[in-house]
Amino acid sequence: MAKRKIKIGLVDADLLCTGTRHPNLALLKIAGYFRDNGYVRGYTDDACCYELITNESNFEELQKYDYFYVSCVFTFTIDDPPLVLTTLLNDKKLSKRVRMGGTGTYANLSVEEGFAEKREEDMQRLEKDAFLNTLKNKSGGYGINMQTQMPDYHLYDDFVSVMENVKASDAYYKDYKEYSIGFLTRGCFRRCPFCVNKLERKAMPYSKLSDFLDNEIDETTGKLKRPYIYLWDDNFLASPYWEPLLDELIATKRPFQFRQGLDERLLAQHKRGEDMARKLASANYHGDFIFAFDNWFDRKLIVRALKIWK
């Protein structure tokens, strides 16, 4: 008897809700895991496959999938969910096939409302997923390792090719096409009450750069398809390993950017703040430096840091 061909639907809930300029990193990694296990990208009856659901699929179309992996980064998506998500969660049969996570599902909870438990559950959800644990990872074991899993940077290709004909600007979807994306560190010691890291105490090492750095060459131009790097690190400069990690980024000779910003206060507080500023200023940085200024009481620190930066 032929082995059943499993069909996977990947849902970027934020994309379906209001649109987003960035690909969903969790979905890119899940897609990469299926790719590494021989699944075909794009729906087919002839093989195990996975695809990004990019429109308001009707009820009958949703029946063809065995599992749905739904990621939601923003809480406003849960407040006003897209039709696909509403259908998946409200239908008794379909809801049993749904695995859903992301900061959007819990970020607004207070500690009293169970924020800590929800965050811990969410951070471990995929690595404890029963179905994913039937498939092999690149280390030879079973189950996805979100730290080391190489993303499938082509997951959004079909969506982008369609939408580029709609948007006036060719650059609108460049984040989907031109960047390697990941975290070198995760966490932060600031404990800001509005942040998903509000219970964390430090910045910890996460992925290696090689875990997400894409080296695919464009056959037409002979150049890198993704010549840029962007990083989602929460507070990179708070990591005790900021310097060797920064040196590694610089050594790639690729322009890079910290999309969540850098903690400028550390330029004034850290004993090597001037070295931080000097090294960043001399790096092949992409775009503007983004710095956090979330609390007016930090004004004096910010002023000191700006003087160092200048």
Which residues make up each language-model segment?
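A short, structured N-terminal alpha-helical element that caps or precedes a catalytic domain
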Residues: 1-117
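Canonical Radical SAM [4Fe-4S] cluster-binding loop centered on the CxxxCxxC motif
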Residues: 21-26, 36-37, 174-219
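Catalytic core of nucleotide-activated saccharide and alditol-phosphate transferases
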Residues: 92-184, 193-196
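Hydrophobic beta-strand segments of well-ordered beta-sheets in folded domains
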Residues: 4-9, 41, 65-70, 96-99, ...
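Short, solvent-exposed loop/turn segments at secondary-structure junctions
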Residues: 14-16, 48-49, 73-77, 104-107, ...
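Conserved SAM/AdoMet-binding glycine-rich loop
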Residues: 10, 213-310
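Flexible, charged surface loops at secondary-structure boundaries
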Residues: 1-4, 59-66, 92-93, 175, ...
